[in-house]
Amino acid sequence: MKKICFGAGCLALGLSIAHADETAQWQRAIDAAAARGGGRVTIPAGRHLVGQLDLRSNVEIHLAEGAVLEGLPGLEHYRVVELPFSEGTWSAILFGLNVTNVAVTGTGEIFGNGTAWKIPEDYGGNQEGQRARGLFFADAKGIRLEGFTLRDAACWGIVFKRCADVTARRVTIDSHGNGNNDGFDIEAKDVQIEDCIVDAGDDCYCVKSNDPGFTVENVAVRRCVARSHSNGFKIGTATHGTVRNVRFESCRAEAPTRDFLDNRPSSPNFGRMHFYRPELAHLKVGGGLGAVSIENVDGGRVEGVRVDGLDVAGFMVPIFVRAGTRTGRACGTPPGSQYVFRDIEIANVRGVSESGYASSISGVTGCRVRDVRLRNVDVVCRGAGRARSEVAATRAVPDVSGKYPECNMFGGLLPAFGLWADKVDGLTLENVSFRLREGGEDVRPAVVLTPDVQVLPPWKDLAIRVTSTRDGSAQPGYLYVPPAAKDRKVPLLVALHSWSFGCEFTRSPGAFGLLESAKRGWAFYYPHFRGPNSRPEACGSDLAVQDIVDGIAYAKARANIDPDRIYLLGGSGGGHMALLMAGRHPEIWAGVVAGCPISDVGRWHAETSAMTNGNARYARMLEAVCGGAPRERPDEYRHRSPVTWLAAAKGVPIQIQTGIHDGHHGNSVPVGHAVRAFNCLAAAADRVSDATIAFMERTETVPSAERFVGTDPFYPAPVREIRLRRQSGNAQLTVFNAGHASNYEAGLWWLARQRRGAPVDWTLPTERDKADAGEIQELTR
């Protein structure tokens, strides 16, 4: 008798035939546990043959020491599922669809029996849907995987599609049993993968996006090992939607321990699909392609990627970053999509490049890479030898924009042995070394940056300290002065950090402001103004206001700043401060852009106090700033609110932007804040009524009579379609299809047309004006 234990009870299950198909019995046990409200189903030691087992909410599958859950070969043992949001068919040994609070734990093993599954003769038509995955989750939430081993899956190993709240710890995947042997395939949000080992024939940790309607975000892979014949830590290849805030931290990339396939004579796949790469012949069983591969080739949105701490050996190159158009369509053209590829930082990487190929960072015409930072990178390169490197040194790199992205996609070696970059806007190299191994031979330079690469200085080289004229303290910030400032007056862009950060948070809008200022030959100032809005000296205080004024004076003293072209830009907390500065110091600004701003901190205290999803913390921050709630300290709240001061800013050109969905779905600043700020600046006849504001905040729509009619290429429909636009005097309000968002690209284009003292320029942009689509910032407060 075998015992299946769950909850406080235990269910006895009898099996009369050793090693028979146990699928039905185990499925009954899982269903029984679910019917009792959930609990644990324990798979005891021994071999258990199963087809597909459907997981249930609140049920944990526990693999005891010595337990082997072995997948039966052949699709007839699996319930093949088609999903409306994903092409192809899906099956798995453990299948979790629309489940919540599920777990797979223990020290036992799931054996995919991959070598027993037949694959088509033509690898190009590998028919992934005809082979079962190891574990598959879709539209699931609250997934916990811990301790077990997955061996030789027939296809991908562990798959998350449109999932949320995922944790995997101390999981081992050893999978070389068939084609497409990925380790983790991640299309999910709020994911933590820690202390795992993947030894696989295909990509090990693969973050991707197939569904444009689902945002893949907040993914962290920490202290993990990747051993691969393909890519170690990857974003892509599928990038149809949004992927953002992905971190690979303190990881290792190593050579795999087995051939591309098991390749035993007893295997039905013997001799097939064994990829032999001459470049890696010196490794025992070959090696991988890119240790880190970050790709955007389907016209989607990839941003906020961090690699911090990576030891590399056994891969052709350590770093591969690629924008492309593998489907042959222009970037951002699929319905509802908007191409963005930016904000990538790769830091503290050391190791070996095992081939003559170079690491690369490259885009294509119309699809460029923006804001890439390499810091503390030390790579020893194998080199290609004299003869091959002499040819490669003068070789023209072909256009391979539609080709499948891999580090060796360029039809031959690149003109550098260490790093090659092309079509990059904003590349920063800080303490970066690519050097030949001892005895290595290669005539190519270590690093080649084509003329189509914009190089930026490291942030540390821009750091300044500005002495406050109010309290004498030294306030941090960053100042960029372009070379052109030696010969002529240049504009100054001042960008303001968001609510919960200081100037150390250089992602948004700091990185955007620096990059765009450098492109235009402008000066750029990024002040701290007393840091996060959680202390009395921050959050619109007199000290914070004066810090910005002092910083501008500091810039003027060190650069030839045009006083009629000083611009201000900020979003969220930065939008709050931008409006406050417009009202308190209107004499400075040629133009101000405020995205998703907080305009009345007293009102916002009441709103966030009633919010969930953690937004109530903003009310607590305001109480810490003001010394109590609004009823206790009304003067403090009024003093720090832009609506108190904006009447003085009617002579300043001001553009206010916000998303119609802000204040909903976890977003924290209701749309009424932007609208009421506009009303402070507008003539009475142009103001938005209180009834319309209430309707917008309640329904996330605009009354039909108020809807914007027209087009603006900076707000493409439907993904960023304008819902309402009002202009009055020097002020413009744009409410568009977004959450807590600012459109800095639109704002900066408009700012560049403004001059202090001149009439405001409301010229509508054209498609030609919009050179780079989609610098819309989804903000972190």
Model features per residue range: what roles?
Residues 500, 504-509, 590-591, 597-598, ...:
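Mobile cap/lid helix-loop segments that gate and shape the active-site cleft of serine hydrolases
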Residues 501, 556-558, 564-613:
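Primarily recognizes the serine-hydrolase "nucleophile elbow" in alpha/beta-hydrolase
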Residues 656-658:
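Short beta-strand/loop motif that positions the catalytic acidic residue
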Residues 626-628, 660-728:
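Active-site-adjacent alpha-helix of alpha/beta-hydrolase-fold enzymes
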Residues 456-486:
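N-terminal cap/lid segment of alpha/beta-hydrolase-fold proteins
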Residues 486-490, 495-537, 601-602, 664-666:
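Short substrate-entry loop that stabilizes the transition state in hydrolases
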Residues 18-455:
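Extracellular/periplasmic carbohydrate-active domains that bind, remodel
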Residues 539-559:
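Alpha/beta-hydrolase active-site loop
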